Amino acid sequence: MGILDSLKKPVNIKSSLPKFSRSATSINLSSHPVSSRSFLELPPELFSITKPIFKLLQAHANKIYFQSSDAEAVWNVKDSSGHVFEAESISLLGSHIIITNSSVQVADVAIIDSPSNINQCEISSVGEFLQFNNGQLSITCNDFGLLEKFKRLCMISIFEFISIYKALTGTVISSYGLRMSDMHIILNSPFNFKDWCEVYLDGQGWVKVWCHIDKVSKTNNSKSSSDNDAKGKYQIRFYRDDKSTSSKNCVFFIPDNEYVQDIFFYNINAAEPSKNMNDFFQGLQMIKLVGNVRFCSDTDFNDVVDSGSIYSSANNGSGDSSSTALNNESPNTTPKSRTFFSPKGHRRNSSHVSSLTSRSTKKPITNFTTRTNGLLIRPLPHHGVHHLEAMIRFIIPLMDCARLYGRPVQFKTERTDINSLMFGLPKLPSVDYFAEEEIAHLMTQEFNPLKEKDTDDTMALTMSRFSSYLQERMTKVSKRNTELNFRTFSDVMGMYNTTRDHSKLNCMSDKDNSVKEFSLSDKSNVSSETTNMMNQLQVNAHEYKSSMCERPIVASTSPIA
């Protein structure tokens, strides 16, 4: 009974935020120092179970998906300034397009997010050009069939990259979640969550907002059958501050019936993963939502900035600063250098998993604009709680509301299940999601446009198209892992230099140190280990739910160990 009584008491955690200045030219993605992000050391078992996935990320960064030859075709490249030149060679190395011209200069452009190009993953056809990231780079070829092949290989690279991160997300949730004393409460508390976070907005940078998942009014939902009406029973809403959950205070939202393809942990520097796993996990600070987001039509983003926080530049070097310091900005500070802050300096009480019984009801928002390029979220750390724990507490309610990966009922864990975070995960030493024979077929595969009516986003279309194809292949060819040809870890890491020297891709006669570092002596099956741990988490949650069925929890906040 003492334990149950303790669950009713809210736990207040005082938090202070580091001080930031606003800059239009530089963005520091490690704005929170390691000391404030990581109060506790990472458990050794986390490194052990995630090592195979870490190897897959290393292999992906070194895969050559495409490499042109002089006799193949003529390639012309247009940079962001509009300058057009003929390329000597074009390669797709991991998620980077490497271009050389006759003067041996190199262009290196990431086709997914990078520190200099946040929340950008766009491939489109503009006239005769294949355009990347809204004109950052455009490529054309006199062989249009070859250009289409290049486009599809770019999409395969994106698919594999995101799929590895989805598997990493499932592995971190299952392994680290077992250490969280109240994980059963998190799993049994769908549609009840509120906490501060930062979101990245184009043209604004990182903005601090109040995230709230709750119920919307049923009576208002039934008034209209219009497609433009927000009809979701539950919604993820992001507010300017935590003072009001009215529609006027809402900036953007995601109903539970809106299209969301995927949600997973993310590292903006992931295109060039660190060789040090501890550094990698310290950089794993974001949540990527691939899908549609509804922006309130009357939102003034300048107003959001003034009432929230912009974290778009370097840390001032002082580490954590008190909320009082945040409030001591000079009133004469110019907009360019001013540090914005939320009301009351953002002094939080805790991350909130609200009770199962005390819910509020919001009115639906009917005046909005839908954007399809998803959302990049950075949960804010709590003192005494590792940032990975804060990430887990944040991402599961998002998955619940989006109805992804079996949630809010039970995580799907099988690698053959298209709705699982572990779907299609290669078994080392193989590092490919698709066999060579399947990739050849994908170059001419027709995709059903009727299945793609919900989005025009490159990342969402990529995950939808290639997940469906992979599911079809796994169903038809049960022994594809042994009957078809897949590249292995040594094929990728042993043939190509793991460092990019910005001149050209060099073959290697000997394996470098990274190959020795990631030896395959520990051929662990991360998929089965993660499945076992995820199942144990869910057993614990079900047992707890059964034991509490006659006495529901009544608490305003979740207990945090």
From Swiss-Prot:
UniProt region (Disordered), positions on chain: 314-366
Residue list for modification Phosphoserine: S514
Cell location: Cytoplasm
Highest rank taxon of the organism: Eukaryota
Broad class of the protein's primary localization: cytoplasm
Low complexity bias: start-end ranges: 314-323
Gene Ontology CC terms, in alphabetical order: cytoplasm
Pfam families, per the entry: PH_26
Keyword terms, alphabetized: Cytoplasm, Phosphoprotein
The keyword Cytoplasm belongs to this UniProt entry's keyword annotation: yes
Composition bias type Polar residues, residue spans: 324-340
Note: Present with 3360 molecules/cell in log phase SD medium.
Protein name: Uncharacterized protein YJL016W
Annotated source species: Saccharomyces cerevisiae (strain ATCC 204508 / S288c)
